[in-house]
Amino acid sequence: MFGYASNETDNYMPLSLDLSHLLLIELAAIRREGKEMTYLRPDSKSQVTIEYNEDNVPVRVHTIVISTQHDEFIVPTEQTHEAQMVADEKMLSIIFEDVKNILIPRVIAKLPERLKALFDDKLILHVNPTGKFVIGGPHGDTGLTGRKIIVDTYGGKGGHGGGAFSGKDPSKVDRSAAYAARHIAKNLVAAGVSDEVL
């Protein structure tokens, strides 16, 4: 079992995971508000890649990947493969521009100044890179328990013992020992003993 903490963020989580969560929280808020990006559906995922310097200090947000479920809001007038491809490309283009011009600025606005400075014009943005994403949630993925164990912890930074947390009571060390190790790591970083603990 592993516990991890870092002083990169106020909640002692890795910056890449924290930004990824914030992107999805804000995307869900936009969907619930229902004023912009009205085609959004509930399923989504994100990944953020951070560039670090030699001293392991974040220097910039390198890449953001956002995949978001959406309505099929552009329907081709003809029932041909070519017409469907054109409609799909238009949808994906609109979604890309909305993520770039609506979602990303809203997320940046909520960040502390030191993190806002990590966003630059070299940011690589991938939106729905595998194409349209109309079918999602349990309809698109069956068997949701224990499938995303890395995102349940530290997003690839730090370690993971391999066991899922879902569906386990506190007597199972996969869950309880990982929580205890995180508690220890977080308190060591919060006390200033170290910048990062695993």
Predicted features, each with a name:
Residues 44-46, 62-64, 121-125, 129-131, ...:
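Structural beta-strand/beta-sheet cores of well-ordered domains, especially the beta-sheet scaffolds
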